[in-house]
Swiss-Prot record:
Name of the protein described by the UniProt record: Small ribosomal subunit protein uS11
Superkingdom of the source species: Bacteria
Subunit structure: Part of the 30S ribosomal subunit. Interacts with proteins S7 and S18. Binds to IF-3.
Function: Located on the platform of the 30S subunit, it bridges several disparate RNA helices of the 16S rRNA. Forms part of the Shine-Dalgarno cleft in the 70S ribosome.
GO-annotated biological processes: translation
Pfam families, per database record: Ribosomal_S11 (PF00411)
InterPro entries: Ribosomal_uS11, Ribosomal_uS11_bac-type, Ribosomal_uS11_CS, Ribosomal_uS11_sf
Any GO CC annotation of this UniProt entry: ribosome
UniProt keyword annotation of Transport present: no
SUPFAM superfamilies on file: Translational machinery components
Molecular function in Gene Ontology: rRNA binding; structural constituent of ribosome
Keywords, comma-separated and alphabetical: Ribonucleoprotein, Ribosomal protein, RNA-binding, rRNA-binding
Organism this protein belongs to: Limosilactobacillus reuteri (strain DSM 20016)
Amino acid sequence: MATKKGTRKRRAKKNVETGVAHIHSTFNNTLIMITDVQGNAVAWSSAGVLGFKGSRKSTPFAAQMASEAAAKQAMEHGMKTVEVEVKGPGSGREAAIRALQATGLEVTAIRDVTPVPHNGSRPPKRRRV
């Protein structure tokens, strides 16, 4: 029996004025999730979702596009101001923050929440190119 390719219901519009933009920037990708103050997801996007493949996902331009897409989704739900939490060492950190400001969201605070180990697990070996 063939599976039905269903159309998913569009989520109800959430009226959220302020929120938190979580930017997770890795060496390979940049993920942006915009939540309300309690942490419930309002909108999200990533460089991979937008069609960037391979090494193009890790570029600042891909992070900028992902950030703009997430911001537009959040603004459809009525979001106006965001606090930004940046996590990770990737190259798309600053580009994503600038794109959030350019789309019309007011950035009230920027926090770096990159986890720093207190001498935790052993890091990967150094690359010899």
